[in-house]
Design a protein with these regions (language model features):
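Boundary/entry segment of secreted carbohydrate-active catalytic domains
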Residues: 15-48, 57
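Aromatic-lined carbohydrate-recognition surfaces of secreted/lumenal glycan-active proteins
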Residues: 103-106, 156-160, 164-166, 173-198, ...
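Substrate-binding cleft and catalytic face of glycoside hydrolase catalytic domains
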Residues: 52-68, 83-165, 309-314
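Aromatic-rich peripheral "rim/lid" segments of glycoside hydrolase catalytic domains that contact
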Residues: 269-271, 275, 284-292, 296-344
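Aromatic- and glycine-enriched glycan-recognition loops and surfaces
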Residues: 33-48, 71-95, 138
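A solvent-exposed, charged loop/short amphipathic helix patch at secondary-structure junctions
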Residues: 64-76, 121-128, 223, 264-283
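Short, acidic/polar
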Residues: 34-47, 133-146, 192-202, 287-296
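Aromatic- and acid-rich polysaccharide-binding/catalytic face
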Residues: 142-146, 150-159, 191-230, 249, ...
Length: 344
């Protein structure tokens, strides 16, 4: 697979000098989530949707914040998370003219039930930090080698690790140098939309400013288009200012909306057990939110694309999918198709 225009062919201690990339080639991606090997028709379906890049998420596992050990099993888990799945999907993507993005995540065991999240990972003890950073380096370097092997165009070096990113900037600088010694593609980090992306100290060592774009847009029930457009205004201003100051384009490393009533107020919120089988889908708000995003943000000069969350490899018909982030089989899918195909 061919890499993008800005392959990093630089000495190991250098950083990109200007990563403002040709905006006529937007990254139009979805995160593919497949328990089993998807049918041969899956990637052609995404190409017809206008997708240019397929994003695959891999996992490392921590038992808790207090335990700095990171475990990984790249040959187990879901098909799309495995090394073999990445190899096979990248080969099919390449045959279709599609590109691949690898986006490793840490799964913090039980965090959804115990109130823990990966942005809080951090330690008062230096030895604990060193253990975590050693394990994280092993984790990321595995996927740096895999990304180089399969010709992935972009590698996301971290996702929503706010405390580490803020307190341990030198670790991330050193990790970037190490990754670039084995991987020639483009790099970004996926920073949370709140309390993180404007405070990252190593953006200039990366090719994109990566943002998990779950911005609150309106707390009103049944918001109008005007309300949602106004909701984007403050975020657009901040993103534009940061992009201009750092001379880096922005990539929305995640952007998605559920088809539920409060999607504009709490776009990050996952389906709860209480909703399953009781809440009614609101397909209109999901389609509306995507439409406003494309109208208000998509053509901004600082934006280089978005990774939409998410697309199931095998169509799930459970209520969790009906109330989840996927636009598959919902009116939002047609909104995405219209904008993605018109951008090419």
């Amino acid at each position: 697979m061919l890499f993008g225009v800005l392959m990093c062919l630089l000495p190991l201690n250098c950083t990109p000098q200007n990563s403002l990339i040709d905006q006529t080639h937007m990254i139009q991606s979805v995160t593919l989530d497949a328990r089993n090997k998807p049918s041969e028709a899956m990637l052609p379906t995404l190409k017809e949707l206008g997708v240019t890049h397929v994003t695959l998420v891999q996992f490392g596992f921590q038992r808790s914040i207090e335990d700095p050990e990171i475990r990984m099993n790249p040959d187990a888990g879901w098909y799309s998370e495995s090394d073999q799945g990445a190899r096979e999907l990248s080969q099919q993507a390449d045959s279709l003219g599609l590109h691949v993005i690898l986006k490793p995540h840490l799964w913090l065991g039980g965090y959804s039930h115990q109130g823990q999240s990966r942005n809080e990972i951090g330690y008062a003890d230096e030895d604990m930090w060193n253990k975590w950073e050693t394990d994280y380096t092993v984790f990321l370097m595995h996927y740096a080698h895999l990304a180089e092997e399969i010709g992935a165009e972009i590698l996301v070096i971290g996702t929503e690790l706010a405390r580490s990113a803020h307190e341990r900037s030198q670790f991330w600088q050193d990790l970037i140098v190490q990754i670039r010694s084995v991987y020639q593609g483009q790099l970004t980090y996926a920073a949370n939309w709140w309390e993180e992306y404007e405070e990252i100290g190593f953006w200039e060592s990366l090719d994109f400013i990566g943002v998990q774009a779950y911005f609150e847009l309106s707390d009103q029930p049944n918001p109008t288009d005007a309300m949602l457009s106004e909701g984007w205004s403050i975020h657009k201003e901040a993103l534009s200012s940061l992009s201009e100051r750092l001379n880096r384009p922005v990539l929305f490393t995640e952007l998605g909306y559920r088809n539920v009533d409060d999607a504009a107020a709490k776009p990050w919120r996952w389906p709860s057990r209480d909703e399953i089988g009781t809440a009614m889908p609101n397909n209109q708000i999901q389609a509306q939110l995507y439409n406003i995003f494309f109208h208000e943000v998509w053509n901004e000069p600082w934006l280089h694309g978005a990774i939409l969350w998410k697309w199931h490899g095998d169509r799930e018909r459970r209520r969790t999918a009906e109330l989840g982030f996927t636009p598959q089989g919902k009116p939002a899918e047609e909104v995405i198709r219209q904008w993605f195909t018109s951008s090419q």
